[in-house]
């Protein structure tokens, strides 16, 4: 990021790391460095398919169903070897959830695998939460391929649905499972999600100590990240793992060094306190970092975050444009930047129809002060 980009790194909601500011001139050098480190595939088509989000600590968590490593390795191999899958649309994703202390119930994927203690997976498709196929750990790659190929056949040409939920909405999940030759049974999709209180700071996983730290809105200065990694190595850490909560986990520390790692992360500007206000807000880089951004949204997002109630989970989405890259999921309140101000969308996404248009930053703050208590109070089921 320092040598080939602009020194800025982004942590995404898909547990990916983005190197920003790469140019046509620096891209070849970046590719060479990433290949040397074993971080990308030489074939761009294969790399594009590796959109897999898995539980970040399954091998250390005694509450997890089992270690996902062998199954996910088989899944990656199938994605790499089956050339038919290269027709899948961009952003087609697979989630593999080991349950445990850091479950992925709030992370959506086109195909979702949930592990059980008996060594099997329940395979769900987006748009259907009450029906699933079942497969063993060694069958996860084959099951994912069958469901993905069924999606391609039923979706048809470029005019067809580009995401699984849209296909299920049109054709029904039963038709998709039948096309994939997958037997199904009633099963409820898990909505258990990890609390940031179980992610940030120092936590024991059996005999292992793990330190979690987050980046404000997922943005990291590469120099600070490098300093953090060097400190973790000095303290004897054995891994740094990305998570889908725009945070990372450092493992392999003893109790004294874990506390030192927490202090070092905080001193370097990373978030270790789960009550930090900006954790309640999703915000993209906005202008000028992104060409699509209409405003400097993170400045506003940081200011507005102090007006939100304490708690766990994202309440507010501030987007630089209607694409809504920082948060694809609906949010209690979304402010989408425009040339004239901000559009407000309630219980929706950045590109949805707004309830109010072209609000100034001051008007947004006034709205949050007067209506926030109502909007951000959890709705009780009737």
Task: Report residues per predicted region.
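Gly/Thr-rich phosphate-binding loop signature of adenosyl cofactor/nucleotide-binding cores
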Residues: 181-230, 234, 271
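Generic surface-pattern signal
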Residues: 57, 80, 152, 169, ...
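Small-residue-enriched alpha-helical segments and adjacent helix-cap loops
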Residues: 1-124, 129, 134-138, 142, ...
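Flexible, glycine/charged-enriched surface loops at secondary-structure junctions
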Residues: 8-11, 85-89, 152-175, 182-196, ...
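Generic structural signal of hydrophobic/aromatic residues within well-ordered alpha-helices
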Residues: 30, 75, 164, 173-180, ...
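Mobile "lid/hinge" segments at catalytic clefts and subdomain interfaces of large enzymes
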Residues: 92-170, 329, 334-382
